[in-house]
Amino acid sequence: YLSAHGRYTTIHLRDSQKHITTKSIGEIEELLPENNFIRIHHSHIINVDFLYKIIKNDGYIVELSDNTQLNVSRRKQEDLMQFLKNM
């Protein structure tokens, strides 16, 4: 998954490695294949191949296969559900 930190983006890899880039998360989003990646929050993009489950609480939380949990913003909840429905 990817996480934004100001003007930097951290790319989190399967093996717990992290790479930091000076590209914004928006710039990277434009380069990613749309059928594998979805933006779930202003600060997060996930690879749906590693989506383990969705937890509904007050909002939605995605849990990835490495047990990472990320909040889904209210504005992105419907996008996520539609994306998964169309897979």
Model-assigned labels for residue ranges:
Residues 1-65:
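Conserved binding/recognition cores within well-folded domains
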Residues 19-23, 70-75:
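A short macromolecule-binding patch
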Residues 54-58, 71-72, 77:
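Alpha-helix boundary/capping detector
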Residues 64-66, 74, 78-87:
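Eukaryotic intrinsically disordered, low-complexity regulatory linkers and tails enriched in Ser/Thr/Pro
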